[in-house]
């Protein structure tokens, strides 16, 4: 399965879940409850899902939120499975350690898609070296910064005006640099994802 590049808004409505983590996809609706499934006429009633269907839906939520294709997600799950500790938190920590995600969490881009663009175009340094691979896993204590030429990009300016900084990173908004201080706690991450279902889904596939 390739990375989903279609409308985030359409996918968010189908999953009844904010992929952008801002709720922006639902700003034209009074609430997420009762949002119609995309299609010719939508659907007023969502069918009850089987256990597998629930696992698949939660996997899709997490997959689209972090902007990964299925192969990338399986690889990260395999990495998380080899780590000591609780697998569900290991999975979140691995996902949160991706470079594109850290650029997003530090408030340098309004979305993860925008963060991937900054990384891919060579605008990001990690510990003083250019990194252009969005999927690179970054170690705790690493310093992530934007090159000076990126400071005036509209994408970056928009993020700095509106994007909150995650509590597990420290950011200097004057130099546009940040440090990955610690792994996030569960209550600092999106609550609308059931990571246990995601783990159950991949346990059958990744040995």
Curated annotation (Swiss-Prot):
One of the primary rRNA binding proteins, it binds directly to 16S rRNA where it nucleates assembly of the body of the 30S subunit. The lineage of its organism: Bacteria, Bacillati, Mycoplasmatota, Mycoplasmoidales, Mycoplasmoidaceae. Part of the 30S ribosomal subunit. Contacts protein S5. The interaction surface between S4 and S5 is involved in control of translational fidelity. GO terms for cellular component: small ribosomal subunit. PROSITE patterns: RIBOSOMAL_S4, S4. GO terms for molecular function: rRNA binding; structural constituent of ribosome. SMART domains: Ribosomal_S4 (SM01390), S4 (SM00363). It holds the Pfam family Ribosomal_S4. GO terms for biological process: ribosomal small subunit biogenesis; translation. This is Small ribosomal subunit protein uS4. InterPro entries: Ribosomal_uS4, Ribosomal_uS4_bac-type, Ribosomal_uS4_CS, Ribosomal_uS4_N, S4_RNA-bd, S4_RNA-bd_sf. HAMAP family: Ribosomal_uS4_B. Residues 97-165 form the S4 RNA-binding domain. Keywords: Ribonucleoprotein, Ribosomal protein, RNA-binding, rRNA-binding. The gene is rpsD. Belongs to the universal ribosomal protein uS4 family.
